[in-house]
């Protein structure tokens, strides 16, 4: 009887530590959870997670996608929800009133230290601290030494030129040792496929 009690207690503690499941509603948490969490820990992701241009090798192929709306999130109130609190303050307040565990991920790490702190935080939440620490160590050890004339970078998506002055993109460029291309592009549609396939008719 005593052995059974000890086993049950250990099983409960193990489940409590690693049984937490997550709903990701931001691109940042989509990417980092795909890197740090076990597949069974991720129950739903944002619509960004289906976009290979944003997710690269971490595209969501088998999880439902959710919009940041209360009705869509009601079935997931027992999960830990990652959401951009700055964009959806009212939704965050409503979720907290309903007892949901909300973790703000504002998608705007301004510095390397903020990015590394976020990675370590998610590593702790997912129970994967060792991998998170290794990832941070790897990023810190990178030595990006590019020729200065070649560091100007134009970022494109499938809908046009990416505004590289946004904080999240600035942090990425800084991490890679790159600088935004300073050319007077207009806000016209500039899809990447037109650059890669200039001779194709549209």
Give residue ranges: language-model regions.
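Sec-dependent signal peptide recognition
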Residues: 1-10
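N-terminal signal peptide c-region/cleavage motif recognized by signal peptidases
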Residues: 14-17
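Extracytoplasmic substrate-binding proteins
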Residues: 20-21, 91-161, 179-184, 189-191, ...
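A short, structured surface patch at a secondary-structure boundary
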Residues: 21-85, 198
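Hydrophobic packing residues within well-ordered alpha-helices of enzyme cores
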Residues: 32-33, 91, 95, 169
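Alpha-helical, coiled-coil/dimerization segments enriched in small aliphatic residues
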Residues: 47-51, 59-60, 163-188
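Acidic/histidine-rich, surface-exposed loop or edge segments in extracytoplasmic proteins
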Residues: 53-58, 72-77, 98-103, 116, ...
């Amino acid at each position: 009887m005593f052995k059974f009690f000890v086993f049950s207690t250990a099983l409960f503690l193990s489940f409590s530590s690693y049984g937490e499941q997550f709903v990701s509603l931001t691109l940042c948490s989509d990417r980092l959870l795909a890197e740090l969490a076990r597949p069974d820990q991720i129950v739903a992701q944002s619509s960004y997670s289906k976009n290979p241009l944003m997710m690269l090798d971490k595209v969501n192929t088998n999880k439902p996608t959710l919009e940041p709306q209360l009705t869509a999130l009601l079935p997931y109130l027992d999960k830990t929800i990652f959401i951009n609190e700055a964009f959806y303050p009212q939704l965050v307040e409503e979720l907290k009133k309903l007892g949901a565990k909300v973790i703000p991920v504002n998608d705007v790490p301004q510095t390397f230290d903020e990015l590394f702190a976020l990675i370590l935080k998610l590593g702790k939440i997912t129970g994967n601290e060792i991998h998170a620490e290794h990832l941070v160590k790897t990023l810190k050890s990178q030595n990006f030494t590019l020729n200065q004339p070649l560091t100007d970078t134009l970022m494109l998506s499938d809908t046009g030129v990416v505004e590289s002055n946004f904080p999240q993109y600035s942090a990425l460029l800084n991490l890679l040792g790159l600088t935004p291309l300073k050319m007077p592009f207009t806000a016209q549609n500039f899809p990447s496929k037109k650059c890669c396939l200039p001779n194709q008719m549209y």
